[in-house]
Amino acid sequence: VQYAQTVDKDDPVISCPFAYNRIFFGAPGTGKSYLLEEQRKKYFASPERYERVTFHPDYSYANFVGTYKPVPLKNEAGESIITYAYVPGPFMRIYVEALKHPDKIYLLALEEINRANVAAVFGDVFQLLDRDDDGNSMYPIHASEDMKCYIAKELGEEPNKISSIRIPANMYIWATMNSADQGVFPMDTAFKRRWEFEYIGINTSEQQMSHYNVQFGQG
């Protein structure tokens, strides 16, 4: 969050020795999700410090970031009523947690990222993927009124103190991607350049699984 008055950029944050925006890619079955999960358990072990979501063709910006939705409630008389509220998606939930706890690192894990139209899913959040040397978003985006109210409520601030948002340096986004599969969406160059790609091949997968012993039945 960028406040309308001042922003303290000197708050120290801890980190892990990997890229902030990272995609594990390779053929299906090569262990991409396994490797991501092993590193997740090492650096983001607490359940409240990560969220995992699987992309699919119908996944949208509203699912990923958040949107205004009807929410059922009970009034004082105990009657069911429908009201509307901003319902955050996994991106916004992890983003807010990272802002609340700048001394901890948080992970958003995106499985099968290219099974959705990433340009549509990320929307204006796409601009936040450019990070500076400290890991913060280089360029802020304008926060909608609904988003401002939600963030302000979570942080105990006034909405008018929030003018824009940036991804903080303690928030990591890692993803898996099938490079040879049907039913996937292409990624444009502008999107790709904002990520560090790590190829997971057959040999890499074999090395990851080398410490397991597999016993076959007799007879």
Regions found by a protein language model. Name each.
Residues 1-219:
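C-terminal regulatory/interaction module of P-loop NTP-utilizing enzymes
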